[in-house]
Amino acid sequence: MDVALLTVGDEVLAGDTMNTNASWLAAELTDRGATVRRILTVPDDRVVIAEWTREFADEYDAVIVTGGLGGTPDDVTMAAVADGLGYERVLFEDVREGLRAKSAAFREANPELAERYEFDLDIEEAARLPEDARPLVTDAGWAAGCVVDGVYVLPGVPDEMKAMFHLVADEFDGDVVSETLYTPTPEGAMGDVLSGVRERFDVQVGSYPADPETPNRLKVTGTDERTVADAIAWLRERVETVPTPE
């Protein structure tokens, strides 16, 4: 399964927030056997989000869009995804009732905050999802996400994103296998070995240099477990290896 990750947020592009969501999702998807082909960050711009949602949905098996589901005026992701896929947004009654319940529970649990501040929560707007979407709701956050036409729309707050991803994680299981070994050998001294393993085995090999105190990482990925194991064994015979760092 080929997947694209689309991160939405002016704050990410400005460097105010680290894009930890994309890194976490890429690792989770790879471990499950999916292949992440693209990672892109775009601003909170409805037209731009719609364009990239449409392009990625046409090109890849699945798209995960994160961010822009809050209640502020710049949170336009859900509307943009609907635009990109050619859907109208409709009111989901069950989502609306769930949001009302969450709002009431928050006010009850935080009476001083509720009395001191005016919370302008547009529940009707937040409950409007693309027609034919499958709503995604967790207790970790307020906003609802959804799945529609292979596009997964998740919140940008990391804990909320992770909780919602776990609702759909099994849908990304694939047949990719990977193994990793560590070596103190400099990357520049392994050119022939890396070329050789690619020529002999139907695998992909990633070499990830580290700092002087951390060994380099070699990651072998393929679709056949035995082939990956054989490639790792071939590498172990030709490069110095060290235990996995703690």
Predicted regions and their residues:
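Conserved short beta-strand edge segments in small beta-sheet-based binding/regulatory domains
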Residues: 238-246
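Glycine-rich phosphate/diphosphate-binding loop of Rossmann-like nucleotide-binding domains
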Residues: 1-44
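Glycine-rich beta-strand-to-loop/alpha-helix junction loops that act as flexible
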Residues: 8-10, 65-73, 156, 221-223
